């Protein structure tokens, strides 16, 4: 028994010595703080159990466009978890991510989805029920800046798509609608969380155009006695996307753990954590479990209405695009 005890102690000691300490950096968009705080703990425990290695994941959050620029400019992110595919494509165009990144994981590398809804003050004093209510005189709207925020670009395109569908796909009328909406915007923050703080903490505005997960978080954390969620008749299917940053993981030799980190988002535990943080899960079993948490509404996609992100970016958010045009007062 003594020999066995000594041998077991030595085995534990050698295993401890062989265990590696690994650090990853996840550069993410603005309102994913709570999601990844919870997910990172779960993945670290999973990886420890699978390999014996200790992995610590650091986080960086901000407007998705600004975050993509920081990775392009050299911040050593092992993975990016950004608001939309265009921002990952922008990094790929600079050679830091493989150009076929979107096909490396299921569902076009979007492990969870969301949509765009409205957050209003309790009692809905301005009677906001659908997109057309946002252009009424005297309605103060809060949304982030599409030049820096991925969520803001989803907001903008959701409004544009609604206007198209209610004006026989007339692009000029859709532009007039979105221009009228932005005339009612009181504050343009750089990111989605900043806009939430403007509306919730600073008390500015009658309605916040928000990620569904952000609106649900606000009502659940700050009280349903203060805010209400209004789900419009239709909105856009928002698909946040993820990728390893190839140049960084090759340099740091973190490819295996970085890939596993993203793949685990699709696991039952990863999907459960996404749902608990108010993202719509891809996994059918998890989605069924949380079915009552997510209202039914008509959803259109970026490809169906705008021809994909590259075209949407060029038409609407590049210099001289429709956002610049409607911003001229």
Curated annotation (Swiss-Prot):
It comes from the Bacteria. Residues 1-19 form the signal peptide. The keyword Transport applies. One of its GO terms (biological process) is sulfur compound metabolic process. GO terms for cellular component: extracellular space; outer membrane-bounded periplasmic space. InterPro entries: Sulphate/thiosulphate-bd_CS, Sulphate/thiosulphate_BS, Thiosulph/SO4-bd. GO terms for molecular function: molecular carrier activity; sulfate binding. It is found in: Periplasm. NCBIfam families: 3a0106s03, PRK10752.1, PRK10852.1. Belongs to the prokaryotic sulfate-binding protein family. This is Sulfate-binding protein. It comes from Salmonella typhimurium (strain LT2 / SGSC1412 / ATCC 700720).
């Amino acid at each position: 028994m003594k020999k066995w005890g000594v041998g077991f102690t030595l085995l534990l000691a050698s295993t401890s010595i062989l265990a590696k300490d690994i650090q990853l950096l996840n550069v993410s968009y603005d309102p994913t703080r709570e999601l990844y705080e919870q997910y990172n703990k779960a993945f670290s425990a999973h990886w420890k159990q699978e390999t014996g290695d200790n992995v610590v994941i650091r986080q960086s959050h901000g407007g998705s466009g600004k975050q993509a620029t920081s990775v392009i400019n050299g911040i050593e992110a092992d993975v990016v978890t950004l608001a939309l595919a265009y921002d990952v494509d922008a990094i790929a165009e600079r050679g830091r991510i493989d150009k076929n990144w979107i096909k490396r994981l299921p569902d076009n590398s979007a492990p969870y989805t969301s949509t765009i809804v409205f957050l209003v003050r309790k009692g809905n004093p301005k009677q906001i029920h659908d997109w057309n209510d946002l252009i009424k005189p005297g309605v103060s709207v809060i949304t982030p800046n599409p030049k820096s925020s991925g969520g803001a670009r989803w907001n903008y395109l959701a409004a544009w798509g609604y206007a198209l569908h209610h004006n026989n796909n007339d692009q000029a009328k859709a532009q007039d609608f979105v221009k009228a909406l932005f005339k009612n915007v009181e504050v343009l923050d750089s990111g989605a969380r900043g806009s939430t703080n403007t509306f919730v903490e600073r008390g500015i505005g009658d309605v916040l155009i928000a990620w569904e997960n952000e609106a649900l978080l606000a009502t659940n954390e700050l009280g349903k006695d203060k805010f209400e969620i209004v789900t419009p008749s239709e909105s856009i299917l928002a698909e946040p996307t993820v990728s390893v940053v190839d140049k960084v993981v090759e340099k740091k030799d973190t490819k295996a753990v970085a890939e596993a980190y993203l793949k685990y988002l699709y696991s039952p535990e990863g999907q459960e954590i996404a749902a608990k943080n108010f993202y719509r899960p891809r996994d059918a079993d998890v989605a069924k479990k949380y079915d009552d948490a997510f209202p039914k509404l008509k959803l259109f996609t970026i490809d169906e209405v705008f021809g994909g992100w590259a075209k949407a970016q060029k038409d609407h958010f590049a210099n001289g695009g429709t956002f610049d045009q409607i911003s001229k007062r």
